[in-house]
Amino acid sequence: MTTEKPTGSKSRTSRLFYGWWVALAGAMNMIVSSGPTFQAASTLFRAIEDEFGWSRAVVTGVASFGRFGGALLGPLEGWLTDKFGTGKMVVAGFTIGGAGLIFYSQLQGPVQYYAAYFIISLGFSIGGFVPSMAAVNAWMPHKRATAMAIVIGGSSLGGVFVPAIVWGINNHGWRDTTFVIGLITIAAGPPLAYIAGKRAPEYSDLMKQVAKPYDDDETPKYQHDFTAKQALRTRAFWSISISHALTNLSVGAVSAHIFFQLTDPNGVNLSDTSAATIIPIMALSSFSFQLIGGFIGDRMSKRAIVPILILLQGVSLVLLSAAVGYFGALLFAVIWGLGFGGRTPMLHAMRGDYFGRKHFGVILGMSAFPMALGMMATPVIVGRVYDNTGSYDSSLFTLAGFCIIAAVTILLATKPATPK
């Protein structure tokens, strides 16, 4: 998975198992790589709309265009991670993403706007989620769901910095704000790559070094590492991928449009300042339930719990549609965090439990392809519906319906038999 020489289970400066440091580095990676383009995306979109006066579909459609690169590169970046290692992918991706943010700060028209966002998304796709998860999957087979929850939690924690980004936009302008974020991104790449880029020991050696044996009944003590071709032939791969893609339809829409829904007069109708506090609450709620979900996922059947959490994600969308005032928005934020936050690490951990470590990067990349396609489509479709109707209600109810379908689909994801 990674390129450095193997290290022992304990770091030289700490008695903490090194895999936890890899998970923490992955969390920091996600804070940087997802903060400006995922958690804070709608605040930047509002600033762009205010300055240029473009339609809602044009402004938010950039999220779809940016994810197009991620969709195309999903399988490739997984293969590259397995071949070259997490460290090299993080340095390359953060350099590209940071340069894209600097370019973004200088844009003057829609062509530059879309090109800059594509570069940003491309960089963070290469150096962000897939390599971080591949490293954690290699290091932490004994506590896979918990470790993955820490990494994914970093994405949620990126939302904690939304008020700071809003403050920067209001006081220094969106151009200076994105320029500084770009510099921070480039600087963050090498240290994160150094920590996460150390190669995990062989599976048998790793299991001798961990403090405790497996306590997850779904995870065998010795796993078969499925190849990508073998994984594609299983019902579990497609059930997990389809379910994950359906649930992420609403994730793409919410990340692009939440600030608009919270501040629009025909939406929740909050002030910009009040709305900026809801997004960190969403982030903290998601982060908390991601950790709880990871902890539970290492001890109970993930396949039994995930459908309930997916349904709660759908319920939160209905609550957002009905929300009037701050309390309604707050209720949405908490329930969204419970559903979205809790189910996310479990879905990813199921892949590791079912398909092993060796080819996890490319298997995750192939799964990310339909997820990225869904997240690519919904921002622009929801924006177009809003431009035509002046409301997000029909879109939110439709996305809730997709969550119901996903809750049924994941039940089909039984553990595949070991290929002969």
Identify the residue ranges that each predicted region occupies.
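C-terminal ends and interior cores of transmembrane alpha-helices
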Residues: 95-108, 312-324
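Hydrophobic core of transmembrane alpha-helices in multi-pass small-molecule transporters
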Residues: 31, 100, 112-127, 328-341
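Extracytoplasmic
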Residues: 21-56, 73, 77, 162, ...
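Helix-loop-helix hairpin linking two adjacent transmembrane segments in secondary transporters
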Residues: 155-201
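Intracellular juxtamembrane helix-capping segments at the cytosolic ends
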Residues: 48, 126-140, 342-355
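Interfacial helix-cap and linker-helix signal at transmembrane-aqueous boundaries
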Residues: 48-49, 80-81, 163-172, 262-263, ...
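Extracytoplasmic gate region of multi-pass secondary transporters
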Residues: 37-45, 229-288, 295, 378
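C-terminal transmembrane helical hairpin of 12-TM major facilitator-type secondary transporters
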Residues: 274-276, 280-350
